[in-house]
Amino acid sequence: MKFIFAFVLCLAVAQTALGAIIGHDKVQPFAQPDPVTISEKAAVKYKPQLVIFDSCVSFPAVNAAGDITGGLKGTSGTDACTKAPLGSQVYGRSTWYQGKWAMMFAWYFPKNFWNLESRSRHLWANMVLWLDNPALETPTILGASLSRQTLEVPKWLFIPSGVQQKNSYSKATPIPPMGFVGTQQIRTARIGRFQYTYNYTGGSTISTRVSQSYPDTSGWVGLDFTYLDGQYQDLIMWNQLTDQARAALESADFGRDTKVPFNDKNFEAALAQAWPF
């Protein structure tokens, strides 16, 4: 009897240490702290905007106590996920990688989508922005890598209804002009039946804009550069999270199809896959 009591007590202590699984709309996001270090200042300066097309908005995945989101069942389209009532969140982590400064920005979504249909619970998406040196007054953006899903495509009558992606990142060096906040495209001349030349006016040289949309005609939802301005979310860097939140993101099980890309377990491997040079 004493053994059973001790075992149950240990389970309770472990659960308290790791936090609980709570409703997707009950997770309190972290407020964006004032940046102090060089890496924090660069991350805030180059934080991207996110635009949502036909899928869930981004939600916080963990709170200060280490409680983890339970996500949403992959049914009923965008029901219950068109607005994050407590606010959205973008997560960040930076490091030197093969002589370039890599800044990962990651978003969590409570549902995953294929071809405009909600299909499963949980999705992590991320963007890696590559700089020359974060210590410079205005670092140069060398390129960007946007995550995509390599899941098997659904089948119709045993026939795949699309093409399965082989690479987990799309890569751009340099970033296309329309990938920057505020940029407008102006058609200047026609050079073929469906071909034109363009000029690009205005826009930032620092802040990028990406969409959670469908880069292919049909397929799994993923990140892509977009022609519309979006919204910023409060940024919390990996080292700014509480110990409980970091521990929760290390141990949380979001399923076999999506992983936390910026935790200790996955960060280096993600940068290797995202490397565009």
Curated annotation (Swiss-Prot):
Induction of its expression: Differentially expressed during the developmental and plant infection phases.
Signal peptide region: 1-19
Glycosylation sites recorded in the entry for this protein: N199
Entries under InterPro entries matching the protein: NPP1
UniProt entry tagged with the keyword rRNA-binding: no
Motif (Hepta-peptide GHRHDWE motif): 119-125
Pfam families for the chain: NPP1 (PF05630)
Compartments where found: Secreted
Record keywords, A-Z: Glycoprotein, Secreted, Signal, Virulence
Location (main, coarse): secreted
One GO cellular component term noted in the UniProt record for this chain: extracellular region
Entry similarity comment: Belongs to the Necrosis inducing protein (NPP1) family.
Domain description: Key residues/motif important for the effector activities are degenerated in most NLPs, including the nlp24 peptide consisting of the conserved region I (11-aa immunogenic part) and conserved region II (the heptapeptide GHRHDWE motif) that is important for phytotoxic activity.
Job of this protein: Secreted effector that contributes strongly to virulence during infection by P.capsici.
Name of protein: NLP effector protein Pc109095
